[in-house]
Each structure stands twice: as structure tokens, then as C-alpha cells.
Amino acid sequence: MAKDFQDIQQLSSEENDHPFHQGEGPGTRRLNPRRGNPFLKGPPPAQPLAQRLCSMVCFSLLALSFNILLLVVICVTGSQSEGHGGAQLQAELRSLKEAFSNFSSSTLTEVQAISTHGGSVGDKITSLGAKLEKQQQDLKADHDALLFHLKHFPVDLRFVACQMELLHSNGSQRTCCPVNWVEHQGSCYWFSHSGKAWAEAEKYCQLENAHLVVINSWEEQKFIVQHTNPFNTWIGLTDSDGSWKWVDGTDYRHNYKNWAVTQPDNWHGHELGGSEDCVEVQPDGRWNDDFCLQVYRWVCEKRRNATGEVA
């Protein structure tokens, strides 16, 4: 170690006695590379070795002292935390746990209450919806009944007026159609809801002081179809004796006609025996001659007059 220290002192003496560090030498001028030549730049001259070693030792001692001080502070702080702050922290933690537990319980209770309330509201809505639907159905039924009465009100009013007049005349005058008969342009019509052969239908009408309907105009034709569609219906036209005739004697040749295309054809292909001598109105209103034993609905007609007899 002593030898190394002497070597270091010798190196320092040599550096101080170097001729290039003594200002200007004999016959020469001291050149400073960093000053004399601006184009030459290099690192600054190195510090003495002893100074560098001293700086390193001081830095190490300072770092060691700081670490020891930091360790002491940590130990003291930890000890205080374990003694006082730790207990307070534990208390605060327990308080937070309790508050969270209470919050969870209250929230769960509120959710259950909302769910129960929502279920009851849903039941009420369902019940109200059912009641509303029933009320709508009742209103629709009342509306339909009202429309029905309004539709038949004029007929009912005429019937009441007719009955009043009949009572005032002590039965001597009858100016309205019988019950279940429909009045149209001075005639009374009865529409069947079952079927008969043509001859049986005509006989039924005669028992009512009427006959199978005789169609005299397009207006009457339209009225008949409105009440018979979609059924095939017998009318009072036949050619059983070889020529077409209306049952009330109306002239066939000059009266209204509404035959379907190619009709009458007296077709025999029905394989029922006999010819087609009776007329039925089809659902589209066109006339067709048919086998008289076919079973169709029918319409009776009679004129309305003061005595109620068939005109």
C-alpha cells in the first residue's frame, strides 16, 4: 500500500514538472489545443487519480447513509402502523364491510319490492286488458244490434202503421204486407229457406193467396237477386204445355226477360227423365230452364191492395 502511494505521488510530480505545462518554454510557445486551434476539439484533461478516488468513496458513504436512514424510517413507520394506524385501518375496513353489507341488503330488498310491485302491476294490466276486450265485444254486439234495428226500423214502422190502420178500420182494410213478407213497389214477397220441386212450390204460394214470383222489370229482378243470392230459386215461368207462360197470365213475349247465354235449351242430359220445363234464377241473376223435379228455394208474390187479396 505504501509503495502504491509513493507511485501515485511520483506520477503527480512528473505531471507538474512536464515542460509542456510550464507556460512558454525556451524558444517555443505553449500551445493549447482547445484554444490555439478552434478546429481541434477534444475531451477535457483528466482529473488527478486521488481526487477521483476520493469522490467515489464519498459518494459510496453518502449512499450507504441514505439507505440506512430510509430503512430506519420504514421500520419506524411500519411499527407505528402496526401499533396505531393498523388498528384504525382494521376498524375502517370493518366499517366499510358493514356499510357494504347493509347496502347490499337494502338494494336486494328494493329489487325484490320492485319485482313484486311489477308483478302486481302486470296482473292488473292483464286484468284491465281482459275487461277492455270484453267491453269492446259488448259494444260491438250493441252496435250490430243497433244497426239491425235501424235497418229494419222503416219496415217495422210501416208494419205498425199498417196494423194501426187495420185496427181503426175494424179489419175491413189491409194496406200492408203480412208478417214475414217483404214489401216492394206495391207487392209483397215471401222468400223460402228450404227447397221444393217447382209444382210443390207453386202450390205452397197458392195456399198463401199468392203465386211464384213474376219478374216484370230489371228493378224487380235486382230486388229478387238481392234476397236469393247465392241460391238457385224457382220463379213462376213454365212451358209444360209447349209454350212459355207466367203463372199469373202475364204476356211472356212482351214482358221482361233475363235468360242466360244459350238458354232456354230444354237440355235432356241431366238423366232425370223428361224435359226442362221450369225456370230458376241462378245466383248471378240469369234465368235457366231446368228439370221441374229439381229441389230449389222459391219466392211467393202477391199484390198489396185494400183488401189484402191477390190482384
Swiss-Prot record:
Annotated keywords: Calcium, Disulfide bond, Endocytosis, Glycoprotein, Host-virus interaction, Lectin, Lipoprotein, Membrane, Palmitate, Phosphoprotein, Receptor, Signal-anchor, Transmembrane, Transmembrane helix
Stretches assigned to the Cytoplasmic side: 1-58
Residues with PTM Phosphoserine: S13
Covalently attached lipid (S-palmitoyl cysteine), positions: C54
Glycosylation sites: N102, N170, N305
Tissue specificity of this protein: Expressed exclusively in hepatic parenchymal cells.
Main location: membrane
Nuclease among keywords: no
Protein localization: Membrane
Transmembrane annotation, as ranges: 59-79
Motif Endocytosis signal: positions: 5-8
Record topological domains on the Extracellular side: 80-311
Disordered, as annotated region: 1-44
CDD domains xref list: CLECT_DC-SIGN_like
Disulfide bonds, paired cysteine numbers: C177-C188, C205-C300, C278-C292
InterPro entries documented for this protein: C-type_lectin-like, C-type_lectin-like/link_sf, C-type_lectin/snaclec_domain, C-type_lectin_CS, CD209-like_CTLD, CTDL_fold
One Pfam family linked to the record: Lectin_C
Chain's role: Mediates the endocytosis of plasma glycoproteins to which the terminal sialic acid residue on their complex carbohydrate moieties has been removed. The receptor recognizes terminal galactose and N-acetylgalactosamine units. After ligand binding to the receptor, the resulting complex is internalized and transported to a sorting organelle, where receptor and ligand are disassociated. The receptor then returns to the cell membrane surface.
Subunit text: The functioning ligand-binding unit of this receptor is thought to be at least a dimer. Interacts with LASS2.
Additional record remark: Calcium is required for ligand binding.
Protein name (database record): Asialoglycoprotein receptor 2
